[in-house]
A protein has these predicted regions:
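Catalytic Walker B motif of ABC-type/P-loop ATPase nucleotide-binding domains
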Residues: 392-396
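Conserved signature/switch motifs of ABC ATPase nucleotide-binding domains
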Residues: 369, 387
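Conserved ABC ATPase "signature" region
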Residues: 145, 348-363
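Helix-to-loop junction immediately C-terminal to a conserved catalytic motif
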Residues: 303
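Helical segment within the ABC ATPase nucleotide-binding domain
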Residues: 407-420
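Hydrophobic anchor residue at the start of the ABC signature
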Residues: 381
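Transmembrane alpha-helices
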Residues: 115, 119, 152-184, 217
Length: 477
């Protein structure tokens, strides 16, 4: 159909040209002959390279100015509000206005088309990049702040790589506009280039050359745009070994964590109300209950992701890890670096040990896009443990694992919890998981917005625990 469309266009053009002279409308055959004569002359290619150089210069300047402005506008709303009126001013004026201004400033020559290209595509770059920064996955930022990754590294390894797809999409958007802006600038105020050659042909009434140049410009523009559309850049970044992150933790001063009369509201509705709970140090505590009972909210309060509660939360250690329900892996870092970024002091062999514990040591240098959901969950757990936390929060940590991996992982975590000084709090709906891994359990109710049953599990017979927990869940405490 594509070839049929082109053929039909050429036939119609040829038929119409029969009713006019070549001075008014040359036919496609003579136009193609003229085009081949032009491209056989080195002067033509010199003109073309000059136009291409102007386009490239305008693009580089636009990216050099627009990307940093868009980056900081995306990070800082006040800065965005400050520059937005000026950028919109650039965006609103027609091209001929900038040609007139640039002719006053630069005269006729190389810089006028470059300036026109800059002012035409610069606003699009700024707005697209700022929108890209604002749409950066907030879960990744939340994860980075939990692990106390410095702001400089968040910018370097999360924010900045996240704008690369937006830079690529912006190039695809502006490609045709850039090419046309340069040619128009050359046509009206150039001293060299394809647009300038087109203006000379027009001035001398050489209609065959006008049409030949037009066909070439259309073809070159299409090729330029199609080439950019094929760009599909997925950033891949390696973490340097010399980054430093320090955490000061007084390990000899860890105490039981206490929640005293804690109330937290969301959209003017209490999620938990006057909650009192103790999480014993170096023990594993479990939270169960129906959806909406506040289990995950408690994890978020302890991790300081959620704020604005009333009451008191005491003795939360500085180093807190969180095994999220979603994986929250940084897409452009491999598995090794997704772990290293939370604890840069680890060597690759140390990271391999954590991955081996999860049964995925062979995935150490694979990127997240190549991992299954279960593998991502295991990397999530390995990262949390590699942080060497004093409080480990786990939100449905085994939900996407197969049974064999799940049982093996539970046994591994039991060993870790018994040998290391880790206080852990787990949210789960599975009585088996809770009975195997927990020392104490709290059952929460969405109706009461509080704890309705609690049980010390250490002194219970293991074979009875799962049934006891299941019965309590079904009967609501």
């Amino acid at each position: 159909m594509y070839l049929l469309g082109i053929t039909t266009f050429l036939v119609v053009w040829q038929i119409i040209s029969l009713f006019y002279t070549n001075l008014t409308l040359p036919g496609p055959i003579i136009t193609v002959e003229t085009l081949f004569n032009l491209i056989g002359d080195m002067t033509f290619w010199t003109q073309f390279l000059n136009t291409f150089l102007k386009s490239l210069t305008g693009l580089v300047i636009s990216l050099g100015v627009g990307v940093p402005l868009g980056f900081f506008a995306g990070l800082n709303k006040k800065f965005d509000d400050f520059i937005r009126p000026a950028v919109m001013f650039f965006q609103g004026a027609p091209i001929v206005s900038y040609i007139a201004i640039s002719m006053l400033w630069f005269g006729i020559g190389f810089y006028t088309p470059v300036f026109v290209a800059f002012v035409v595509i610069f606003p699009t770059i700024v707005f697209n990049i700022s929108n890209g920064i604002r749409s950066t996955d907030k879960n990744l930022i939340e994860m980075a702040k939990l692990y106390k990754i410095p702001q400089s590294l968040i910018r370097k390894y999360i924010y900045f790589p996240s704008i690369i797809p937006f830079v690529v999409s912006t190039l695809k958007i502006i490609s045709g506009t850039l090419w046309r802006a340069v040619v128009v600038g050359e046509f009206l105020a150039g001293a060299y280039g394809i647009g300038y050659s087109l203006s000379l042909s027009k001035a001398t009434l050489n209609t065959e050359e006008v049409f030949a140049y037009t066909i070439f410009l259309i073809a070159a523009g299409i090729i330029f745009e199609k080439s950019l559309l094929k760009i599909n850049l997925n950033p891949k970044i390696k973490i340097k070994k010399n980054i430093e992150v320090t955490h000061n933790e007084k390990t000899d001063n860890l105490k039981d964590i206490e929640l005293d009369n804690v109330t937290f509201s969301y959209n003017d509705t209490n999620v938990i109300q006057n909650l009192n709970m103790k999480i014993e140090k170096n023990k594993t505590t479990a939270l169960i209950g129906e959806s909406g009972s506040g289990k995950t909210t408690i994890l978020y309060l302890l991790s300081k992701i959620r704020k604005g509660f009333t009451g008191n939360i005491k003795n939360v250690p500085e180093k807190v890890s969180f095994v999220y329900q979603d994986d929250r892996l940084i897409p452009w870092l491999n598995v090794n670096d997704n772990i290293k970024i939370v604890n840069p002091n680890l060597e690759d062999r140390d990271i391999e040990k954590y991955l081996s514990m999860m049964g995925i040591e062979e995935k150490q240098f694979i990127y997240p896009e190549k991992l299954s959901g279960g593998m991502k969950k295991r990397v999530n757990i390995a990262r949390a443990l590699a942080y060497n936390p004093k409080l480990l929060l786990l939100d449905e940590p085994f939900s996407s694992l197969d049974l064999k991996t799940k049982y093996n992982l539970i046994e591994d975590l039991k060993k870790i919890f018994s040998n290391d000084n880790i206080t852990s709090l787990i949210v789960s709906h599975d009585p088996y998981e809770i009975s195997e891994i927990s020392d104490r359990i709290y059952l929460l109710s969405s109706k009461e917005k509080n704890i309705i049953w609690e049980q010390d599990l250490e002194n219970e017979e293991k074979e009875n625990l799962a049934n006891i927990i299941k019965d309590r869940i079904i009967n609501g405490g």
